[in-house]
């Protein structure tokens, strides 16, 4: 079976004009990437005011160098969608995967409507690699231990569930930094998906997508009466910054 793993880079999260698309065609029988392509979208690239609002506009020199070296092609959005559509048909692709796929699906839907182009994913089932990773990697005690050892936490103190952190873990590379370019990200996300398959996941599944991977911790519960401890025990609780390591309860009266 041939599947597509893809990624998009957009100017922002709301007006999601796409400026970079990368994808791999992956053979599930040989576990090898058989084709990979990357494009910068001409309509956004040449709109200087629009492109310079992009999250990663500082990568413009990088994209320029890649286009000069012909490792990335500058093409109109419609060309890219037609190219993907033809490749999917040629290789009988019926499944696609992306990390946090609802966002990338929204990107294609928005841009296809804006530019009046065919959506190559209209008849393709798209599955979320993040859901796979949380289910088969993130919920393991080994992964949580690695997060604790390396402080791989979110701003709210939960366990990290980004592609960057999952890739650090499976490759045992604590210094890995995600490039946030579409093809490179597609390649590392393919590796994450393959690791999940090795751990027992099945292609074509829609695993539950949690908003976060909650972190638990041991907390002391102490009950006081007339200034003395009358009960204490250890308990597990969901980590929250505002909760102290020890909870004290004071009983009134005799």
Tell what function each PLM region has.
Residues 150-154, 169, 183-254:
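Acidic two-metal-ion nuclease catalytic site recognized across multiple nuclease folds
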Residues 46-65, 129-184:
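Active-site-proximal helix-loop-helix substrate-binding element of RNase H-like nuclease domains
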Residues 102-127:
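Substrate-recognition/cap helix-loop segment adjacent to the acidic, metal-dependent catalytic center
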Residues 2-111, 247, 252:
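Conserved non-catalytic scaffold segment of RNase H-like nuclease domains
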Residues 31, 138-144, 196-204:
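Short helix-capping/linker segments at secondary-structure and domain boundaries
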Residues 107-108, 131, 188:
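Hydrophobic side chains within alpha-helical segments
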Residues 66-71, 115-121, 173-179:
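Short, polar/flexible loop-turn hinges at active-site or ligand-entry regions and domain interfaces
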């Amino acid at each position: 079976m041939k599947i597509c793993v893809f990624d998009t880079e957009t100017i922002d999260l709301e007006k999601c004009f796409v400026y970079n698309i990368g994808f791999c065609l992956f053979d599930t029988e040989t576990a090898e990437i058989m084709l990979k392509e990357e494009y910068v979208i001409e309509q956004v690239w040449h709109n200087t005011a629009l492109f310079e609002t992009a999250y990663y506009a500082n990568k413009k020199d990088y994209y320029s160098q890649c286009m000069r070296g012909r490792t990335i092609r500058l093409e109109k959005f419609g060309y890219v969608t037609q190219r993907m559509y033809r490749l999917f048909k040629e290789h009988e692709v019926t499944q696609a995967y992306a990390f946090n796929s609802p966002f990338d699906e929204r990107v294609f839907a928005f841009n296809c409507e804006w530019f009046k182009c065919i959506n190559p994913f209209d008849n393709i089932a798209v599955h979320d690699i993040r859901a796979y990773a949380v289910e088969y990697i993130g919920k393991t005690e080994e992964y949580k231990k690695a997060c604790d050892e390396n402080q791989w936490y979110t701003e709210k103190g939960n366990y990290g569930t980004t592609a960057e952190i999952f890739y650090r873990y499976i490759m045992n590379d604590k210094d890995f930094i995600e490039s946030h370019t579409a093809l490179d990200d597609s390649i590392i996300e393919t590796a994450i998906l393959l690791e999940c398959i090795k751990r027992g996941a099945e292609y074509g599944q829609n695993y539950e997508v949690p908003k976060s991977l909650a972190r638990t911790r041991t907390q002391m519960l102490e009950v006081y009466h007339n200034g003395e401890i009358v009960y204490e025990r250890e308990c597990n609780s969901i980590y929250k910054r505002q909760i102290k390591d020890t909870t004290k309860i004071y009983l009134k009266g005799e």
